[in-house]
């Protein structure tokens, strides 16, 4: 006997997600089910899926339950598990507000990348404490077709390779993941950002997200880009004691990234719930059969 399962759709700077509320972690969502739900032609469509679970009900999050009531069980569009999604956290927080679980102000969200602090502003913007960036040593190159560029290795809880280019079109169609060297630099894959300057402390980027392809926005990617650009510009807030703020344009909008002197990075941008409904469990079972 089939049942109806609630879902919502939301986006943060057009990085869009299927949202599945499941407070008690009762649903079985294997990778194939997530991929089917995120399919833009045969499913609901999304760059990824936000599985909304109480931290105490999820084995990966129970250790964070004292700090954060809710766990963002994030999945990429192909069904693979991801450590963190910056735009996803903002949309996750907006959903919690939409559902009446939280109000404007501060809250904590558990993720595989740790507990993230979130602030929901009166104007609708959501600010997320993204943690600190790690800058692993070692030279990395990325390439598309015959073009190749040196890249800055930045880790935001997930790996990023940031390449500065003369023209964003040089990245091509980004249907396939850009190549990287050395081949063993990212054993679990990497998110690749291509960046151009737009003005003082203002850049634009395109991104190929591992497991999802090119997306309209990537929050952790925008943070990685801001940090890489600051270092290229000779700015290190830990050394100067002055925050470094960059405006980062993505195809789906604009994010504002601030790196504080203590190393913490804050990302501010919009988050929107656009629809809600139900899907039939029998459909999903048929897809998985």
Swiss-Prot record:
The Enzyme Commission number assigned here is 5.1.1.7
> Reaction(s) catalyzed by this protein?
(2S,6S)-2,6-diaminopimelate = meso-2,6-diaminopimelate
Q: What class of enzyme is it?
A: isomerase
Where mainly found? cytoplasm
| Molecular-function GO terms, alphabetical | diaminopimelate epimerase activity
UniProt-listed Pfam families: DAP_epimerase
What GO biological process term is on the record, naming one? lysine biosynthetic process via diaminopimelate
Q: Which InterPro entries match?
A: DAP_epimerase_AS, DAP_epimerase_DapF
Name the UniProt key words of this record, in alphabetical order.
Amino-acid biosynthesis, Cytoplasm, Isomerase, Lysine biosynthesis
Its subcellular locations are: Cytoplasm
What are the positions of the active site?
85 (proton donor), 218 (proton acceptor)
Where does the secretion signal sit in this chain? none
Is Acetylation among this UniProt entry's keywords? no
What are the binding positions for substrate in this chain? 15, 76, 86-87, 158, 191, 209-210, 219-220
Q: Which SUPFAM superfamilies match?
A: Diaminopimelate epimerase-like (SSF54506)
Q: What would be one Gene Ontology cellular-component term for the protein?
A: cytosol
Q: Where is this site: Could be important to modulate the pK values of the two catalytic cysteine residues?
A: 160, 209
Q: In which pathway does it act?
A: Amino-acid biosynthesis; L-lysine biosynthesis via DAP pathway; DL-2,6-diaminopimelate from LL-2,6-diaminopimelate: step 1/1
What HAMAP family would the database entry show? DAP_epimerase (MF_00197)
Which family is annotated?
A: Belongs to the diaminopimelate epimerase family.
Which NCBIfam families does the entry link to?
DapF
Quaternary state and partners of this protein?
Homodimer.
User: What role does this protein play?
Assistant: Catalyzes the stereoinversion of LL-2,6-diaminopimelate (L,L-DAP) to meso-diaminopimelate (meso-DAP), a precursor of L-lysine and an essential component of the bacterial peptidoglycan.
Name it: Diaminopimelate epimerase
Report the source organism.
Answer: Streptomyces coelicolor (strain ATCC BAA-471 / A3(2) / M145)
């Amino acid at each position: 006997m089939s049942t109806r399962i609630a879902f919502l759709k939301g986006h943060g700077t057009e990085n869009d997600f299927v949202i599945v509320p499941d407070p008690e972690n009762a649903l079985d969502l294997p990778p194939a089910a997530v991929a089917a739900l995120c399919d833009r032609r045969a499913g609901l469509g999304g760059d990824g899926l936000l599985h909304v679970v109480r931290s105490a009900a999820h084995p990966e999050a129970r250790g964070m339950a004292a700090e954060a009531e809710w766990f963002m069980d994030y999945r990429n569009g192909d069904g693979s598990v991801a450590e963190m999604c910056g735009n996803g956290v903002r949309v996750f927080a907006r959903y919690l507000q939409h559902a009446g679980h939280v109000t404007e102000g501060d809250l904590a969200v558990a993720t595989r990348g740790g507990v993230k602090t979130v602030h929901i502003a009166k104007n609708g913007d959501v600010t997320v404490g993204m943690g600190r960036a790690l800058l692993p040593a070692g030279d990395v190159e990325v390439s598309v077709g015959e073009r190749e560029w040196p890249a800055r290795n930045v880790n935001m809880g997930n790996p990023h390779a940031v390449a500065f280019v003369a023209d964003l079109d040089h990245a091509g169609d980004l249907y396939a993941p850009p190549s990287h060297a050395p081949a063993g630099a990212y054993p679990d894959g990497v998110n690749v950002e291509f960046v151009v300057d737009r003005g003082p402390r203002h850049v634009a980027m395109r991104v190929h997200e591992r497991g999802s392809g090119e997306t309209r926005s990537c929050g952790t990617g925008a943070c990685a880009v801001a940090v890489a650009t600051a270092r290229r510009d000779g700015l290190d807030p830990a050394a100067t004691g002055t925050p470094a703020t960059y405006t980062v344009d993505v195809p789906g909008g604009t994010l504002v990234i601030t790196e504080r002197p203590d190393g913490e990075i804050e990302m501010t941008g919009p988050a929107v719930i656009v629809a809600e409904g139900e899907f039939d469990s029998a459909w999903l079972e048929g897809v998985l059969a």
